Design a protein with these regions (language model features):
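Soluble or luminal CAZymes and related metallo-dependent hydrolases
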Residues: 64, 95, 99, 161
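PLP-dependent enzyme catalytic core of the Aspartate aminotransferase-like
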Residues: 12, 130-173
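Conserved core segment of the aminotransferase class I/II
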Residues: 9-93
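Short beta-strand
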Residues: 19, 113-118, 143-146
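Conserved PLP-binding catalytic core of the aspartate aminotransferase-like
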Residues: 85-137, 156
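Conserved PLP phosphate-binding loop immediately N-terminal to the Schiff-base lysine helix
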Residues: 1-5, 16
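Short, solvent-exposed loop/turn segments at secondary-structure junctions
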Residues: 23-25, 41, 121, 148-150, ...
Length: 173
């Protein structure tokens, strides 16, 4: 919560927007759960933000799903559910960090260049190989191809598969 204290020093004409996606945090994939919070010292700016948000957010993203919001509401109003959620979140976060750490160690060991990784579900690897997706599929590796990079979903990997995966990617990069 301390981070929000920085917003107290904003100029009167500034609108800061804080966004949050609950879909991944709460493992509610596909539920479109999240928030967009406008912060300003000006009531007029906040009123405009609310009015524009009502139309633009609904036009782009539909509306927040009621079941998803109900689940989150139950988690945070029940101390037992909240603690269980926090315990599970810690386990998941620790596992994701361990997978990322191992991938990064293996990438360094095999001189596999990656884009800076600061956390999250994906690690991105630059490539000049225009056939990288096809080459990796032939080696039974499935990644997300993008322009000049591939994204590896480390959230879906078993720890013991990571060293071999890095070697296969390095072979085709």
């Amino acid at each position: 919560r301390e981070i929000f204290e920085a917003y107290l020093d904003l100029d009167d004409e500034v609108l800061a927007i804080v966004v949050f996606s609950g879909s991944k945090t709460f493992s509610l994939y596909g539920f479109r759960v999240g928030a967009q919070i406008g912060l300003s010292k000006s009531q007029e700016i906040i009123d405009n933000f609310l009015r524009v948000g009502d139309y633009s957010v609904r036009a782009r993203f539909s509306s927040v799903s009621q079941p998803g919001m109900n689940v989150i509401g139950k988690i945070f109003t029940n101390p037992e559910y909240k603690q269980r959620f926090l315990d599970e979140l810690h386990i998941g976060t620790s596992l994701l960090k361990a997978r990322a750490s191992l991938f990064l160690q293996e990438a360094e060991k095999h001189d596999l260049q990656i884009l800076p990784y600061c956390g999250g579900f994906f690690i991105s690897v630059p490539t000049k190989n225009k056939n990288i997706f096809k080459d990796l599929v032939e080696d039974h590796v499935y990644v997300i191809p993008m322009q000049d990079i591939i994204r590896i979903a480390i959230s879906s990997l078993c720890m013991d598969e990571i060293p071999e995966l890095v070697r296969k990617i390095k072979k085709h990069i």
